[in-house]
Amino acid sequence: MKDLRLQGPYRKYIPYNIFQQCGIGHLKTLDYIFAFLIVITNFTLIWKSHSSSFWNRPWDNNSEQELSQLIQFYLDKAFYIHELPPFTIQFYSIIRRLKIAENLRYVSLFLNSSTLGFLFLITRRINCSRLISATGLLILSNWETFRNEGTIISFDSLEWCLFSVVIYSFISISIAKLGTTNWFANVITLSISLGLAISSKFIGIVTWAFVILSFVRQFDRLISDVKVTTIQIIKFVILCLLFVLIIPGSIFIISYSNLLSNFKTDTPQFSKYMSTYFKSYLRGPQVQPSRLYYGSTITLRHLDSMVGYLASHDISYPSDVDEQLVALSFEEFAADNEWLIEHPTLNLSFSEVYHADQLIPVEFGQSIKLRHKSTGKLLRASTAKPPISEQDYDFQISCTKDSNYEGGMDERWDVLLIKDEINNDKKDNADDKYIKPLQSEIRFYNNGQRCGLLGHDLRLPEWGRFEQEVLCMEYPVIPRTTFLIDSVQLPVDFQVPMIEYYIGKISSSAEFNHTLSWSQFLYLFKEYIFKQYKYNYYIKYGKNKVTFEDAFAVEKWPITLDTDSPVWFNFAWYGSLLSMIIFMCVQCKRMISWNPWTTAEPSFSIKWEVYNEFGWECIVGWFLHFYIFTMSPHFNLGKKLYFQSFFFSVLCLLESLDCLAK
């Protein structure tokens, strides 16, 4: 082939659009016809290979049952929390609502078949022959994990299809001339599919990072071409910012905005994990007394926990049968969560109290006693060691004695202010010294042991109901000591000054503007994503974490085969890994033998350039999509999560075979 390199000031260089000039990756009408036939053929073969009873069977898979339930939640406009972004649920919900398909399993099968169609187009884009491309289809379609996902309603089928569209669009952009109609068509497709991919599963964010890195590499090629003008470079940067960053990010935010605005019905089994701020959005304004008074019954919520209600159960510590267990509960509405606020020295009687002025409000810095309402025992800190944390500076928290016990210094707690900023615009507000429910973030300091009440994510064993451990520490980390008074029951029946709390705002009147502002939406958006992440590893799989300790280690994915895949598939599986190893060895040899001072012109081969260019893309893509799972905080990781990395390794294998064949 003719040498298409251009002459620079000192030596020849490769223009940024060398692939387009050489006709690399140019698709013909026949290629698109083949891709369409691949989709139809794969769909028909798998559909016909099973009976109608197989496709219409009840949801017999945990993943199907979960996805079906979430779809119903979305259609009912009920609140739910799940570890994945919302677009997959929205996609299947729209199909069910509009009755586009009578069976959602057919939709999943079509998405899997479309993934194969785009794989064929991708291999043709990287200049593989049709025979080599067909080999890639044979490899992926015979992976048992991939086949199984096409026969169930799957969280992954949509993500895999969008992923293949992203890779196809990106490779099409890399071989197209900047600013042409073809370039714009592919960058728009990339932008939309990328936005939908990150809105379907969070692994899409890794794909997003891969695309950004690849565009940085394209930018390097662009500025290395001396014939590219400054205007062209500026246009490239602006278009990349728009189509690679802004539009995908906007689609992601719009997807969540649609989800949040769809929540019209509260679901306590899920909403209990959300903050008071978020719950007021779901349940409406919450009316509470403007101050906390002695004699009130309260619930205390630990702000650093998913639910975290301070609770005591009629369970003794194994090491001390006289002391009653105190923990952070995962139940929102439970009698064990209720505590009476008692004065440290006065024995208050409310039978002759007829006016709010006769009630004593609790001030910051004052001491209180916390009596467990259902058992009558007092909250205390002692020198005994907690059941899980047994450091020298840790003290056990328990409930002790009975309802007649008045307590000593170990049962007295100073209430200290951490934060109180809601509706506090005045610097000299007389109400600032009082504790305010739903507003004041507080911590408790024990007078006897001189330690702070603390909750953390460590869970108690089965005898402690797998709830979170509570302890007292001399020098605690402040965020883990932060509590909020979530609800208050007054000790009297008459009316006292009340406030209405709604999405972080306080009003003393019944009329309130319930329209979401941008700041409120961003707060809800940020909290929902954070709770999704923690719900996944701490709630959904946290209690049963031990169950997954013997599961597939992520590091074993590349060398562990599916037992149900064909025998010949073993060679393709290990061959894909071998092709990446060989590529890295070739690149190492190139770097070792590189001499920047030589005056000799290196030989040029377009096939070699294609191999180097797309080989690096495959290596980086494989590594990013694989390495992210080694940092997972839990062990519930299925082999199907290796799909994106396997996809890149197969592309590397096919490109290597094509390079050898040519």
Curated annotation (Swiss-Prot):
Coiled coil: none
GO cellular component, one term: endoplasmic reticulum membrane
Keyword Cell membrane among record annotations: no
Cystine crosslinks: none
Pathway in which this enzyme or protein is active: Protein modification; protein glycosylation
Glycosylation (residues): N347
Keyword ATP-binding: no
Bilayer-crossing regions: 27-47, 160-180, 196-216, 236-256, 483-503, 566-586, 618-638
Catalysed reactions listed for this entry: a di-trans,poly-cis-dolichyl beta-D-mannosyl phosphate + L-seryl-[protein] = 3-O-(alpha-D-mannosyl)-L-seryl-[protein] + a di-trans,poly-cis-dolichyl phosphate + H(+); a di-trans,poly-cis-dolichyl beta-D-mannosyl phosphate + L-threonyl-[protein] = 3-O-(alpha-D-mannosyl)-L-threonyl-[protein] + a di-trans,poly-cis-dolichyl phosphate + H(+)
Cellular localization per UniProt: Endoplasmic reticulum membrane
UniProt EC number: 2.4.1.109
GO molecular function term, any single one: dolichyl-phosphate-mannose-protein mannosyltransferase activity
Residues in the Lumenal compartment per record: 1-26, 181-195, 257-482, 587-617
Matching CDD domains: beta-trefoil_MIR_PMT7-like
Top-level class of the enzyme under EC nomenclature: transferase
Record's keyword terms, sorted: Endoplasmic reticulum, Glycoprotein, Glycosyltransferase, Membrane, Repeat, Transferase, Transmembrane, Transmembrane helix
Membrane side Cytoplasmic: residue ranges: 48-159, 217-235, 504-565, 639-662
The MIR domain, residue ranges: 289-344, 359-418, 432-488
UniProt-listed GO biological process terms: protein O-linked mannosylation
Family classification: Belongs to the glycosyltransferase 39 family.
Protein name per Swiss-Prot or TrEMBL: Probable dolichyl-phosphate-mannose--protein mannosyltransferase 7
Lineage of the organism: Eukaryota, Fungi, Dikarya, Ascomycota, Saccharomycotina
